[in-house]
């Protein structure tokens, strides 16, 4: 069972390799975005609840393998495992089509700091317990690269192995443009109120 749409291709490949049936048990609401990108846990939890609907008849009484592209904070995975168990799944096994996310991304993907990354702070057993899953397994870094058919040097693997290919300033973050805009606006307001005198250099 894939978590749509991010797990569709990996779940299909998993089904073909193992000979297990592929079931689209979750129906996705395409008007809800990626939950891990939302600014608060409350919004993430709400998005996860309304994003997918389950077809219970495909799950009841079965041992289920759920496939997704990643586990970042664990919000989506936990909700999906619980959905499947509530629908009557006898067992739920989680398979992830990438290695564990161990490091934040400083190149534009909104991964939180390391303290908020599930795999960076918990053992596989702890993740399994948190998700209420019967097992959790990740694709290896080598396996992920092999699946692409491209050489490893074509990819940034920093979020998995901590090797950042381009230097970055950790003081800069995704809010840097907003901070700059706020400074410019405050200077503009001060000039408008004659609280600040412009000087020509």
Feature-to-residue mapping (PLM):
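PRPP-associated nucleotide enzymes
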Residues: 1-201
């Amino acid at each position: 069972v894939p978590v749509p749409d991010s797990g569709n291709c990996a779940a299909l490949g998993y089904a073909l390799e193992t000979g297990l049936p592929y079931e689209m048990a979750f129906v996705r609401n395409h008007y809800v975005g990626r939950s891990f990108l939302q600014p608060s846990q409350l919004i993430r939890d709400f998005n996860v609840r309304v994003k997918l609907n389950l077809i219970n008849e495909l799950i009841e009484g079965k041992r289920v393998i759920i496939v997704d592209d990643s586990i970042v904070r664990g919000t989506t995975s936990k909700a999906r495992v619980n959905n499947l168990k509530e629908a009557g799944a006898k067992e739920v096994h989680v398979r992830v089509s990438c290695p564990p996310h161990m490091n934040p991304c400083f190149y534009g993907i909104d991964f939180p700091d390391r303290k908020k990354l599930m795999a960076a702070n918990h053992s596989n057993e702890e993740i399994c317990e948190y998700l209420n899953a019967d097992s959790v397994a990740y694709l290896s870094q080598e396996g992920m690269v092999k699946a692409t058919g491209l050489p490893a040097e074509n990819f940034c693997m920093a979020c998995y192995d901590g090797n950042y290919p381009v230097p970055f300033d950790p003081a800069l973050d995704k809010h840097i443009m907003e901070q700059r805009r706020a400074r410019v606006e405050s200077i503009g307001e001060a000039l408008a109120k004659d609280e600040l005198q412009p000087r020509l250099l």
